[in-house]
Amino acid sequence: MTVFSLVASHHDLDLDTVARLSAGATGVGPALPGSGAAGAVVLATCNRVEIYAEADGAGVEAARAGLLSAVAASTSLPDEDVHAAFRTLDADATARHLFEVGVGLDSAVVGEREIAGQVRRALTAAQEAGTASGPLVRLFESATRTAKDVGSHTALGAAGRSVVSVALDLAEELRGLTDAAAQRDFWAGATILLIGTGAYAGTTLAQLADRGATTVGVHSASGRAEQFVADRGGWALALGGEAVAGAVAEADVIIGSSGGERQISPERLQELREGGRRPLTVVDLALSRDFDPAVADLPDVDLITLESVRLAAPEQAQVAVAEARALVDDAVEEYRAAQRGRSADAAIKALRRHTLGVLDRELERVRARHGCTAAAEEVEFALRRMVNQLLHEPSVRAKRLAAEGRLDRYEDALEAVFGIEAPGRPASEVGTVEAACPAHEDEGGAARIA
């Protein structure tokens, strides 16, 4: 089995296309059984949709086709367009890519902190849906550990830059607020409406609080506003549907984070504003857009989108980026070594099976001649303990050689010395050698045959 990934992101596609692919990726889980893949985890953020999957080595292309056909079936995009939108990464490239994504090196805002949580939640969602295979779990857990290491040992992201912070910085710039005092005065006096409780809503509310905002209304079409506000200190105001029109009319800033199917049109926004000329800043953080881009043409309305954020994102210090990349390099090599070590399982099991076969045949002869006498049981106990001890060092060496990329030497030795051909399939967990008869502990705590 091998791990691979299908990647579509802001590097290659416009965000509208990414949004449509992201919506289609919800079809991956239900389609998994017939896709040819043994497992899948979908990572969808504001600027990427990526499918991490596991399949038999010879079946990767078939699994790729099956997964992307599931995406296409859940979108209005032609099948061939969906297939062309995704790049395919092999196992080694997949690990490096996910680790770089998880630490924020591949983000529109380099070093952003939200992405690590999104990687973690993607794995959790796949585990709850039953689509995360063991190798995918290990891959994502390694990526999460790497993100923590980068956060602890480098200055990447130390400035707290994120999609939300850059968007709010842009809002300040558009209003000509150049000094800290003016910026804080603006947020303290501004009336703000947050629409939706989507991916960036929690971070947005926290950022607004940090900047001194005091008047924030939150509306959720799905009715989650009250719980959302309560979970975050209760300082904002949850708004029902009947209060939204008035909130829009009074707002200085409206922030969209719902990702719903319907967009607010220029006509509807103008109607809700009651034709007023009060300056309004609209920040659209929804990947699928909460606002029609044409609202930017309305008088006294400034529109900030995810594309605006991408273009305005500041560059991280080169030293911090270099340090983060070095940690990613180390983490990728550690992950690869661990995977190579696991590749020794089949050879270890083959040696154990061969050795136990010899032992069991000899024990059958002993039992046939002497039955379960005390002497025979003592012999069996001693031989099984000896076999466990003899197999320990070869098993350790197999893992070590595999981690060093030299497993072929071990397999050649097995074939040359014992005539064992290691099976080319994943091995189940290999335990200790068990006795054929019940066992109990003697007075010194050692197991003995009953």
From Swiss-Prot:
Q: How does it assemble?
A: Homodimer.
Q: Which NCBIfam families match?
A: PRK00045.3-4
Query: What family, per the record?
Result: Belongs to the glutamyl-tRNA reductase family.
Q: What is its EC number?
A: 1.2.1.70
Role this protein plays = Catalyzes the NADPH-dependent reduction of glutamyl-tRNA(Glu) to glutamate 1-semialdehyde (GSA).
What protein is this chain from? Glutamyl-tRNA reductase
Q: Which residues cross the membrane?
A: none
What organism is this sequence from? Micrococcus luteus (strain ATCC 4698 / DSM 20030 / JCM 1464 / CCM 169 / CCUG 5858 / IAM 1056 / NBRC 3333 / NCIMB 9278 / NCTC 2665 / VKM Ac-2230)
Q: Which PANTHER family match?
A: GLUTAMYL-TRNA REDUCTASE (PTHR43013:SF1)
User: Site: Important for activity. Where?
Assistant: 97
One GO term under biological process is: protoporphyrinogen IX biosynthetic process from glutamate
What is the catalytic activity of this protein?
(S)-4-amino-5-oxopentanoate + tRNA(Glu) + NADP(+) = L-glutamyl-tRNA(Glu) + NADPH + H(+)
- What InterPro entries has UniProt attached to this entry? 4pyrrol_synth_GluRdtase, 4pyrrol_synth_GluRdtase_dimer, 4pyrrol_synth_GluRdtase_N, GluRdtase_dimer_dom_sf, GluRdtase_N_sf, NAD(P)-bd_dom_sf, Shikm_DH/Glu-tRNA_Rdtase
User: Which key words are in the record?
Assistant: NADP, Oxidoreductase, Porphyrin biosynthesis
Positions of substrate binding: 45-48, 107, 112-114, 118
| Molecular function via GO | glutamyl-tRNA reductase activity; NADP binding
**Xref: HAMAP family:** Glu_tRNA_reductase (MF_00087)
